[in-house]
Swiss-Prot record:
Stored Gene3D superfamilies: 2.30.30.30, Nucleic acid-binding proteins, Ribosomal protein L2, domain 3
Protein encoded by which gene: rpl2-A
Protein name: Large ribosomal subunit protein uL2cz/uL2cy
Gene Ontology biological process terms in this record: mitochondrial translation
Gene Ontology cellular component annotations, sorted alphabetically: chloroplast; mitochondrial large ribosomal subunit
Organism for this UniProt entry: Dioscorea elephantipes
Localization, UniProt: Plastid, Chloroplast
SMART domains: Ribosomal_L2 (SM01383), Ribosomal_L2_C (SM01382)
């Protein structure tokens, strides 16, 4: 991904840094429904998720996370922008006439060939089970947790997990969060790293660009009134008046563990995420 710096012609473009434009060529059989950005409100109009609303209309692209076109080679035809995720997607034309979108692997270019199966080469973009001859230290993404359900782990832009061990019926992975976890060796994973690794280098440059993404302004609780937030009130710039910060509803914030206790998958986690 190439970062494009705007020419400083207006205040709004002075700090803008965006990636090179990747167009979308929609296929009717690979899109579904006309979706607006989530407004963060329920059927009664009550805010249930803050800082969301507005945004440009979107069409959902159907992504093939399962990679169940077994042993059929496919060719990358286009690399496209997807407004529903920060990673790019690429259109694959398979030998049997099937067309599908997949996550764009880093380094893949138009014309490359990919394939999924149990006896396929361990090369970028190919999908295969962890039980194959995949060497330790291999970079993978789009990893299944439940066999046949489709990839659920390491799907964001630049995400990559590492295969660090195999023992018995399980494989040990180091996830992008730092968590070390056991996964069934029969689960499918895609070789390589998700593309668009420089997504964090982008700078929107102005508030309007953030609004296009459906993200509304975030107001600090300390500048609110006491009726609106536990941190609010006081004369001038006052401290929060509590030992620890809290949410608008009084629950502990900034560091509290939100994972449920005694969850069924606790036995699969060897090291907690950082």
């Amino acid at each position: 991904m190439a970062i494009h710096l705007y020419k400083t012609s207006t205040p709004s473009t002075r700090n803008g840094a965006v990636d090179s434009q990747v167009k979308s060529n929609l296929r009717n059989n690979l899109i579904s429904g006309q979706h607006r950005c989530g407004k963060g409100r329920n059927a009664r109009g009550i805010i249930t998720a803050g800082h969301r609303g507005g945004g440009h209309k979107r069409l959902y692209r159907k992504i093939d996370f399962r990679r169940n076109e077994k042993d059929i080679s496919g060719r990358i035809v286009t690399i496209e922008y997807d407004p529903n995720r920060n990673a790019y997607i690429c259109l694959i034309h398979y030998g049997d006439g099937e067309k599908r979108y997949i996550l764009h692997p880093r380094g893949a270019i138009i014309g490359d060939t990919i394939v999924s199966g149990t006896e396929v080469p361990i090369s970028m973009g190919n999908a295969l089970p962890l039980s194959t001859d995949m060497p330790l230290g291999t970079a993978i993404h789009n990893i299944e947790i439940t066999l046949g359900k489709g990839g659920q782990l390491a799907r964001a832009a630049g995400a990559v997990a590492k295969l660090i061990a195999k023992e018995g019926k399980s494989a040990t992975l180091r996830l992008p969060s730092g968590e070390v976890r056991l996964i069934s060796k029969n689960c499918l994973a895609t070789v390589g790293q998700v593309g668009n690794v420089g997504v964090n280098q982008k700078s929107l440059g102005r508030a309007g660009s953030k609004c296009w993404l459906g993200k509304r302004p975030v107001v600090r609780g300390v500048v609110m009134n006491p009726v609106d937030h536990p941190h609010g009130g006081g004369e001038g710039r006052a401290p929060i008046g509590r030992k620890k910060p809290t949410t608008p509803w009084g629950y502990p914030a900034l560091g509290r563990r939100s994972r449920k206790r005694k969850k069924y998958s606790d036995s699969f986690i060897l090291r907690r995420r950082k």
